[in-house]
Amino acid sequence: MLDECVNWRFLNELPEYTVKTVRQMGWSGLKNGELLDKAQHKFDVLITTDKNIKYQQNLSEYDISVIVLDVRINDLEHIQSLVPWLKESLLLIGVYDIKIIKETKINKLVSPQCSNS
């Protein structure tokens, strides 16, 4: 599922997955805790650009994994540059895991930093 802070057009980058946006689910405006509570029953992974989610929520309380796209500018072009590493992370992510894919200044030339938290 794509968080509200991720451009909805980004779902077109993941045609091999069933991806919904928060808005499509009718969950716009929910606080992160409420969103995670609802999402854990319908989705395996939440994709977000909210770098603070791991500090604001106790993610171990939810049955959902989280991937944070840590971009300098939160626009479609910048998050699209992370697609190869996002797809790799989706294949490797564990249950209840959080991964951070960090954009680098030369992210188009080298792999961005990808870390578990």
Pin down the residues of each PLM region.
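Short histidine/acidic/glycine/proline-rich micro-motifs that form metal-
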Residues: 25-26, 53, 72-74
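C-terminal structural segments of small proteins and small subunits
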Residues: 66-109
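N-terminal first-folded block
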Residues: 1-42
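Short, surface-exposed amphipathic charged segments that create phosphate/polyanion-binding patches used
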Residues: 35-37, 81-85, 115
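A secondary-structure boundary/capping signal
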Residues: 2, 23, 49, 69-70
